[in-house]
UniProtKB/Swiss-Prot annotation:
One term of GO molecular function: asparaginyl-tRNA synthase (glutamine-hydrolyzing) activity
SMART domains cross-referenced by the UniProt entry: GatB_Yqey
Biological role: Allows the formation of correctly charged Asn-tRNA(Asn) or Gln-tRNA(Gln) through the transamidation of misacylated Asp-tRNA(Asn) or Glu-tRNA(Gln) in organisms which lack either or both of asparaginyl-tRNA or glutaminyl-tRNA synthetases. The reaction takes place in the presence of glutamine and ATP through an activated phospho-Asp-tRNA(Asn) or phospho-Glu-tRNA(Gln).
Domain of life: Archaea
Catalytic reaction(s) noted: L-glutamyl-tRNA(Gln) + L-glutamine + ATP + H2O = L-glutaminyl-tRNA(Gln) + L-glutamate + ADP + phosphate + H(+); L-aspartyl-tRNA(Asn) + L-glutamine + ATP + H2O = L-asparaginyl-tRNA(Asn) + L-glutamate + ADP + phosphate + 2 H(+)
Classification of source organism: Archaea, Methanobacteriati, Methanobacteriota, Methanomada group, Methanococci
Subunit structure: Heterotrimer of A, B and C subunits.
Species for this entry: Methanococcus maripaludis (strain DSM 14266 / JCM 13030 / NBRC 101832 / S2 / LL)
Tagged with keyword Lipoprotein: no
PANTHER family cross-referenced by the UniProt entry: GLUTAMYL-TRNA GLN AMIDOTRANSFERASE SUBUNIT B MITOCHONDRIAL AND PROKARYOTIC PET112-RELATED, GLUTAMYL-TRNA(GLN) AMIDOTRANSFERASE SUBUNIT B, MITOCHONDRIAL
Alphabetized NCBIfam families for the sequence: gatB, PRK05477.1-2, PRK05477.1-4
The protein's name: Aspartyl/glutamyl-tRNA(Asn/Gln) amidotransferase subunit B
Record family assignment: Belongs to the GatB/GatE family. GatB subfamily.
Nucleotide-binding among keywords: yes
Documented EC number(s): 6.3.5.-
């Protein structure tokens, strides 16, 4: 019997704003490299009578930018007030979280509806297994993005988050996936039976969200298949086991007892404020991809790979400009940045910014290949060495240090070709019998004997001359 199974997923994504001070006080937002409970003040830890400062201006500006990038309608000339969201948990010393009403609404991103974008404060860090609470994080500005339940599969949700994190890297001023937490809402319909919505709280990675959805899809299907009922509940993600576990029944807005915070004046956005923020907005990844295809005439797949890393995309454009911005320069830049440099980055599991390489390094390398100072094979070795040395040595320095310049002495090349012919009797016979590809084996022998320092085109000419007579 065939199964009729479908799912709906919505996400509540929280990401930290990269500010120097917290949302409602002057305490530093650095909480990872300091002793617990040192970057705190009476506001951070909810002392009675401690009054919050007006919200951090940079945090508001970044929230506006995020809302605009997600194509939201901005809330203009209306009070945007902060509310107290009440719940009892050790990481929330005041017993409530300050959270704004929407700054932007009714947006869309990759075909997924964006319900709203708003600001709120991050709670502290509670470790139940140790019984400790660190309030250094408490009060750090958070932007929350709430989506409509438009995602229909774990794969779609994963891709949505990947693209959203890429957008965040382009925006800047956000701390990205390392600080991202997502509340994952999922409901399924199985053979005509609609299940209730389940929320899985505080999933802290894209991979985690994907695993949660895969697990919940199977778990909820099995419950309905056995004739059970899906409870409307909140569950926790047990990352070590890759399962979810029931925590409590699902809260509603009434359970949080929202009230306006009497200690904070409302924010009122106007068109002038929003336009000033818009003027500082970067090009979106999607627009950059489209421009790369149109402006440089490269393939969509190549544009997608380059644009996936903002710094890599910037280097590509600078290298193309240095190489003359012509078809040949663009082709070389694609080969050595999109293909070879990206290969080395993926192998080493690092981003471009971690290499300390500069556009000049890539230009120098490509020019060394163009003028045949080194072979393409040696070029691949040099790019690996540049990454390994974190950009401390230029291509020319590495070429000299490793003795990797192309062999220009014809007699030396002829000697290597003669030895390769002697060691490749079968390949030579096959070539003489009409198998042109067999010559590649002999060329490979020459490259091995010369440690890649021979220019392949020159080697082929010498080999043909010697074999064909």
């Amino acid at each position: 019997m065939s199964e009729d199974l479908s799912m709906k997923c919505g996400l509540e994504i929280h990401v930290q704003v990269d500010t120097n001070s917290k949302l409602f006080c002057q305490c530093p937002t650095n909480y990872k490299d300091v002793e617990p409970n040192t970057n705190i003040c009476p506001v951070c830890i909810g002392h009675p009578g401690a009054k919050p400062m007006p919200p951090n201006k940079k945090a508001i500006d970044v929230a506006i930018m995020v809302a605009k990038m997600l194509d939201c309608e901005m809330v203009i000339d209306k009070d945007i007030y902060f509310q107290r969201k009440h719940y009892n948990y050790p990481d929330l010393p005041s017993g409530y979280q300050k959270t704004s009403v929407p700054i932007g609404e009714h947006g869309t991103f990759l075909g997924v509806g964006i319900t709203e974008v708003h600001l709120e404060e991050d709670p502290g860090q509670y470790k139940p297994d140790l019984g400790t609470v660190d309030y250094n994080r408490s009060g750090t500005p958070l932007i929350e993005i709430v989506t409509d339940p438009d995602m229909k599969s774990p794969e779609e949700a994963r891709e949505f988050l990947r693209q959203l994190m890429r957008l965040f890297r382009y925006i800047g001023h956000l701390r990205g996936e390392g600080t991202m937490r997502a509340d994952t809402n999922i409901s399924i319909k199985y053979n005509g039976i609609q299940g209730n919505r389940v929320e899985v709280k505080n999933v802290n990675s894209i991979r985690g969200v994907y695993k949660v959805l895969k697990y919940e899809l199977i778990r909820q299907k099995n419950v309905l298949r056995r004739g059970g009922e899906i409870k409307m509940e909140t569950r926790a993600f047990m990352e070590s086991q890759m399962i979810t576990k029931g925590m409590r029944s699902k809260e509603t807005a009434d359970d949080y007892r929202y009230i306006p915070d009497p200690d904070l004046q409302p924010i009122v956005l106007n068109n002038n404020w929003v336009e000033k923020v818009e003027a500082q907005m970067p090009e979106t990844p999607m627009n950059k991809e489209k421009r790369f295809v149109e402006q440089y005439g490269i393939k969509e797949d190549d544009a997608k790979v380059l644009v996936s890393d903002l710094e890599l995309a910037d280097v590509f454009e600078k290298v193309v400009a240095e190489l003359g911005n012509d078809k040949n320069g663009i082709s070389l830049a694609v080969t050595w940045i999109r293909n070879e440099l990206k290969r080395v980055l993926v192998y080493n599991k690092i981003e471009f910014f971690e290499t300390n390489l500069k556009p000049e390094h890539m230009v120098e390398l490509i020019n060394s290949i163009k003028d045949k100072t080194i072979s393409q094979k040696i070029g691949k070795t040099i790019i690996e060495q540049m990454v390994e040395h974190k950009g401390e040595k230029t291509p020319k320095e590495l070429i000299t240090e490793m003795g990797l310049t192309v062999i220009e002495d014809t007699s030396e090349l002829e000697k290597a070709c003669e030895e390769a012919i002697k060691n490749s009797e079968k390949a030579v016979e096959d070539y003489k019998s009409g198998n042109q590809r067999a010559l590649n084996s002999v060329v490979g022998q020459v490259m091995k004997l010369t440690r890649g320092r021979a220019e392949p085109g020159t080697v082929v000419k010498i080999l043909k001359k010697k074999i064909d007579g």
